[in-house]
Amino acid sequence: MTPKIVLTPEILSSREGVTNKLKDLYSTQIKLLSSKRDAKIPVVNHYVELLEQYEKQNEELHKLNPLDEGLSQESFIELLDNQLSVKVEELAKINSKLSFEDLSNLNAVYSDSIDRFFWDFHTNRITSTYTLKEYIDPEPLMKVHDARSIVEQSIQTTSQILSLNDYPVPKFEIDSIPLKVKCVAPHLIHIMFELFKNSTLPSISRKKPIIVRVTDEDGFVMFEIADRGGGMPDSSLDKIWQFHYTTSKISERDPIHGFGMGLPLCKVFADFNSGKLSMVNHEHFGVSVFLKIPRAFKD
């Protein structure tokens, strides 16, 4: 039997800290979702449907006293773990409700204020998830990694997911110098998966590899993902960073395409890791995407 965790002043203080942080994040999310209650936009309404869930989780935190020594650490972690289980399903819950008509309607009325709503929601969602995981798992999430290792893990993950979904797997070429990067590794792997996935079919159709370059740029690690798949029409460039913009028809959707969350969500993940994501399109030639993440100079 695992011995019961002894409540020390340090543990009680950390419980108070994480509880207060989560209450602030949930309150911000509740305010954000409440501001869109009267929206006449179906996609936004699907987000607003999560309001009750956030109110419930916020109430759970307000009802407990993290400094109460009668509340065991095991019970406290169980509560946070249950909240995490709900939180990681949010995006899937939203996507399961989206129709092609919903996405078309959103595209017709998309604006800066709608973009800001999505950006703030996903930033808060990712921060909440990170805060919960960081407390539950004693292993730090934000740490130093070898940059090339991140690329290789991303290629392996992409190849596995594409194969499992009956997609062809492209060839990759890595041009990397020894560099270390400080990041949440699953976030960078998610970003690279999305970028590799987008380049897969164009690269295969032209029998060209996806090239990944890793270079040093003024204290940052620059990951360049370049393909020679023909590029995109310049006319589509103003849409690609738009949340829920997709060119896929509802009948073409599969587990890895069709929800329009790839690039914009990657940008949120990059921002969370103090980085930036940008793109250069060469119409009729190919696309280069640049992911810039702070360099780590020591472990």
Where do the language-model regions lie?
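Glycine-rich ATP-binding loops of the HATPase_c
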Residues: S274-F285
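Short conserved segment of the HATPase_c
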Residues: M232-S248
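Short beta-strand/loop element within the Bergerat-fold HATPase_c
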Residues: K207-G219
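Short helix-loop "hinge" at the ATP-lid/N-box region of the Bergerat-fold HATPase_c
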Residues: N198-S203
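Short alpha-helical Gxxx[C/S/T] motif in the catalytic ATP-binding
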Residues: G262, C266
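Signal-transmission coiled-coils
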Residues: T2-P168
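Acidic ATP/Mg2+-coordinating residue in the GHKL
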Residues: D227
